[in-house]
Amino acid sequence: MLKNSHIYIIWLFGFISGFNVMITGNTLNYWFAKKDIALQTIGMLSFITLPYSINFLLAPVFDTVQIKYLNKILGHRLSWICLTSTTLISLIFILSFLDPSTDLVLLSFIAFIISFFSAAQDTILSALRTKIVPKESLGFTSGIYILGYRVGMLLASSGAIYLSIYLTFNAIYKIFAGVIFVYLILLILVARYTNSFDVMEENTSYSYVARCYAIADMNLKNKFFIKNYFNYFKNFISAYLLKIFSGFYFHRNDINLAYYIILILIFLVLYRLPDNLINVMINPFLLHLGYNAFEIASVCKFCGVMGAIIGGLIGGIIMKYKNILYSILLFGIIHALSHIFFILLEINGKNSLILFITIGVESITGGMTMTAYIAFISSLCQGKFRATQYSLLSSMMGISRSIFPIISGYMVVNFGWQNFFLFTTIITIPSLLILLKIKTKIN
């Protein structure tokens, strides 16, 4: 049975996840752009969010390892949340004394570590959320979680950029540390009313990893050292992927499973790539056009989030009448065309009306594509390994966000803003062609 305390906890989970992702994401990106850090450098620093791409690898650790002393006081899950939160508070407080102009390398390194612990905390919260919420309440609590997530994002992005009119970012990051401290205290107080935090159970998805190591170790003796370990890694990955994706539903049983898994992974990376390239460069672009902090905070961040929510609702309604593959193809085409508005904005210069239309159209269509994207991933996951399947597939979105945008700054410097946005429109085509290739094979 779903308790009121569970609702508060789920909202807090969503809030802190959305809040943390902005601390080392868009808000830090804006700070870099405001400090006139080179576009090439800003693009390269997208790697800071890389830990979010591999957080599924951390899950077995948090499921099995106990923190000796904290575990006795707070329980297994809450002790991990406490440890990651206090670490985040300390790191963010240290970061608040640095300046991107003079301490860029150290600041970026600390931001990367912050992302690591934020991603780790997300993994813990996701596992805990599935344990304390009854299956019949998953839909309702997902809405509560998303609401908290959006509120956290707004405060840490739009709110922070608006505050930068009156405060330095050093002061704002000290406030960030304070918010996480208050969150931790609230979570501990609310958690005292439920025993759900102490639940531990075996995860069959992760128990299979050990068996994959055994498979990988077969027939690798008496080989050259480097080749031996290369083959070990290759065999482990093959055994792991083929097993966890063996539940995928395909129309034919004789198709090459590994081939289509690779195509699906490539599609998931490329489909989100245009948005991720733009997200890294959007703050420098708007500052380049002459927009101030208030305009960016209100139109681009606040209205952008509202547009994404509206787009998500529209996408959900359309998918009630159209299948997922049709929707993700249609939404992808519409969203790609929306990027043309950025070219119009660059041609016309600072224009509030065009900016509002551009952000509105891009955000709404982006919300539609994201809804179809998540639904597509969810529809692929079958069998007892569906949790691991979902974690791995959704991590492709993180890879697209953290690795490939490294080149975005170089693209702008060498080819200009108009060609950059034209590229983000065209790059959608390969992902849609891959979708057409695989859609005949997937149920």
Curated annotation (Swiss-Prot):
SUPFAM superfamilies reported for this sequence: MFS general substrate transporter
GO molecular function: transmembrane transporter activity
Bilayer topology: Multi-pass membrane protein
Keyword annotations of the record: Cell inner membrane, Cell membrane, Membrane, Transmembrane, Transmembrane helix, Transport
Pfam families to which the protein is assigned, alphabetical: MFS_1
Subcellular location: Cell inner membrane
Record flagged with keyword Transmembrane helix: yes
Transmembrane domains' residue ranges: 5-25, 42-62, 78-98, 104-124, 143-163, 171-191, 230-250, 254-274, 299-319, 324-344, 354-374, 393-413, 415-435
Top-rank lineage group of the source organism: Bacteria
One annotated Gene Ontology cellular component of this protein: plasma membrane
Family the UniProt entry places it in: Belongs to the major facilitator superfamily.
PANTHER family in the cross-refs: MAJOR FACILITATOR SUPERFAMILY DOMAIN-CONTAINING PROTEIN 3, SOLUTE CARRIER FAMILY 33 ACETYL-COA TRANSPORTER -RELATED
NCBIfam families for the chain: 2A0125 (TIGR00901)
Protein name: Putative transporter AmpG 1
Organism expressing this protein natively: Rickettsia prowazekii (strain Madrid E)
